[in-house]
Amino acid sequence: MEQNKGRVTIPTDLDVVPQTLEIMDEWGADALRDCDGTEFPQELKNTGAKVYATYCTTRKDNEWAKANPDEVQQMYIMSSFHTATEDSLKIHLMDHLYPAMLKVNDRDDIRKWWEVTDRTTGEVVPVSEWTYEKESGDVVVHPTKRFHEYTVSFLAYIMWDPVNMYNAVVNDWKDVEPQITFDVRQPKTKAHCMEKLRQFLDTHEYVDVIRFTTFFHQFTLIFDELAREKYVDWFGYSASVSPYILQQFEQEVGYPFRPEYIIDQGYMNNTYRIPSKEFEDFQDFQRREVAKLAKEMVDIVHEYGKEAMMFMGDHWIGMEPFMDEFASIGLDAVVGSVGNGATLRLFSDIKGVKYTEGRFLPYFFPDTFYEGGDPVKEAKENWVTARRAILRSPIQRIGYGGYLKLALQFPDFVEYIKDVCREFRTLYDNIRGTTPYCVKRVAVLNCWGKMRSWGNHMVHHAIYYKQNYSYFGIIEALSGAPFDVSFISFDDIRNNPNLLKDIDVIINVGDADTAQSGGENWIDETVITAVKEFVYNGGGFIGVGEPAAHQWQGKFFQLDDILGVEEERGFNLNTDKYNWEEHRDHFILEDSEGEVDFGEGKKNIFALPETEILIQNHQEVQMAVKNFGKGRGVYISGLPYSFKNSRVLYRAVLWSSSAEDQLHCWYSTNYNVEVHAYVKNGKYCVVNNTYEPQDTIVYKGDGSSFELHMDANEIKWYQI
């Protein structure tokens, strides 16, 4: 396709028909879409552009939901903790929850599907010792054990879809009926939804792509009594439940279900929790069942000669695109929201679809497009951040969403996006059909493995958290780095003795006893001996934060012999420490003038006698290196994402794999500028990741070099 047109999707609405045609021409868009709160204008049916229709599988049909209240979508909720000070204790279930969003499910057998837990002992309270008062909404525990803490785990119907509620609150929608979420997995609703899909296809013959949003369960998102976000887990499964589903689960696994398998002491099995066997069984079951039902809908779409696209987000729980079941669904495309490089890799790395599309920011909503707002700034940051990842794992299309009329009020924004669209088309034409040059094979090791590829240290989609940004920086840096990146689990190591032979460097990043670091997996002799053998024979190991950390047999850092450091937790105060000398002239630090931003870092890390400390701060080690046999270990206390830190990580990978001599290969001496080579296509590019001009020396694949001046954000293409 010619370079000035195509590969771009834009939103439209009834009140911007002429303007839509103008933007189509200006941005070179070849696809049009509707959005939540908009309608597709009939006047645009025959523009020659592909037409996307957003199709919500689980909402936008309140008439059905109200007529079938037993098949409204449900979620598990745990009450707050309550301490018993008397023989009887009342726990109000809806405390600190938005009353219009949730409705307690007392229709099904609460003795089976609810659970009262003594959190002081961890024991389940017998059903004979608690009752539910429907009028007050209280669970009464009697008799209690005084000064023990109690919680109630219960089912609630989702009476206001969380995504619809979020959109309504952000956009201040008035007099709009809250959309009820219904459960497509249940028999009556499934039959209704299949027929409804056919009716939609019958009446929308002009639509080319059905953009499913999504299949079929919302990630965990709960609002408090003030309509503020109370709990969010973009990967959360707690809103994918119902007695109907759980009975099927029981039949498959052969043991009775407990609410605690979902509630998990109130942590809701978030991605920092080491998953239990029962929760893994539940996820396996959900993946199979969701994929099976999604395939039925996709098959119907194909029967009508249209494409089926999935939006990766919202009601997407159970789809798991990096797991084996996903390919069986037969989707044509996946579209995802681009928050940064890692969120782009969440869908650009998906196999088994014809194309992937990135919905870029800003979304055309009034929270960005208001008088005094600066949408160009957000657009620049979004594009330049995501571009690193696209250059490693290209998407095939880009797009935008929201209210087009808002964007039109900012001419400089319209002009900038025109440039982005043009740049993307050039980029894609140059790198399509090839794999970029990768200097090393890097594996991120945690409890989740490939299922959470690129989702490590992500709580909500691309949202900053003080407690994890120093770890997420590693993942973001990897998203645009010239490495062949994989994500492996401890079970992968147990099940495949040869797995590590195809890896150059292992990275383990996170806090002790989390799923990211690994916890008790590090006292499994199969795991720890396999990793030690890998490093001893020449592999690299980079540990960030509290890697391989679990108190066991006189150690907290179980790989202290590789990493060369240990954490002082009071148990080693009696042992004197004399190794505090820094060596800031190390290969890893050559581009950073000896200074590194460790973010939150870690306190109380000390070095063992054989270790080379690179940086310590007030006798707390922040970075250290050590040899172990033919291999090497690198310890880093934290590494927030920045261009400088990305270079530090790059050098750490090379050093740990004893590959310092490979530095000057497709390389820029200025860490603000990066080089990506596409040998099969005979092309390479040099990209300025900053908003200022940059000067650098570029090294090509043969080691030859040249000086280069680059404008802000510029990308230059060359023939090899």
Question: What does each model-found stretch correspond to?
Answer:
Residues 221-224, 405-439, 479, 558, ...:
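Extracellular ligand-binding/catalytic regions of CAZymes and related secreted enzymes
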Residues 8-21, 35-39, 310-319, 475-499:
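A short, well-structured beta->alpha microelement
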Residues 70-328, 346, 432:
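Polysaccharide-binding and catalytic clefts of secreted carbohydrate-active enzymes
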Residues 518-594, 599-601:
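A glycine-rich, often tryptophan-bearing local segment used as a flexible ligand/cofactor-contacting loop or short
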Residues 6-12, 29-35, 171-191, 274-291, ...:
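The substrate-binding groove and active-site-proximal loops of carbohydrate-active enzymes
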Residues 44, 64-65, 197-198, 208-215, ...:
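Hydrophobic targeting/anchoring helices
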Residues 2-59, 63-99:
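Noncatalytic N-terminal accessory/assembly modules of large enzymes
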Residues 9, 15-52, 196-213, 326, ...:
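Catalytic domains of carbohydrate-active enzymes, especially glycoside hydrolases
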